Amino acid sequence: MDLETRVSGHEKPQRRNPEDPDCQYAKTRSSPCKPLGRFEEVASRTSAGSWTHQNGFGDTSLFEIYSNQAITGPYQQMGFRGEKRGYGNNKEVQERSCCHVENNQC
């Protein structure tokens, strides 16, 4: 199973939060920006290479990162906190987390 299928298979249905109009939700994977809510933190590891987070709705979604690289720098600035490690593609993490926790700008 390729990364695209694994990631899309874990997605929750996307919906807008009426109380957070600045955080728009993209509907297609071809969109350059897919904010999934305010990313307060990356929660505990759930399985090899998989991590959970809660988005602005309190939904828990699953995503994967590669290369054992810490989520710091631009990823941390987009709302990820701490030194979370796993496997996956950091580009995918960035793509799926572009709603900034502080200003909701993509």
From Swiss-Prot:
Annotated GO CC locations: host cell cytoplasm; host cytoskeleton
Residue ranges, compositional bias (Basic and acidic residues): 1-19
Keyword vocabulary terms for this entry: Host cytoplasm, Host cytoskeleton
Location in or out of the cell: Host cytoplasm; Host cytoplasm, Host cytoskeleton
Coarse class of the protein's main subcellular location: host cell
Region span, Disordered: 1-31
Keyword ATP-binding tagged: no
Source species, domain of life: Viruses
Additional free-text comment from the UniProt record: Product of an upstream open reading frame of the genome polyprotein gene.
Function: Plays a role in viral replication.
Name of the protein in its database record: uORF protein
Organism: Zika virus
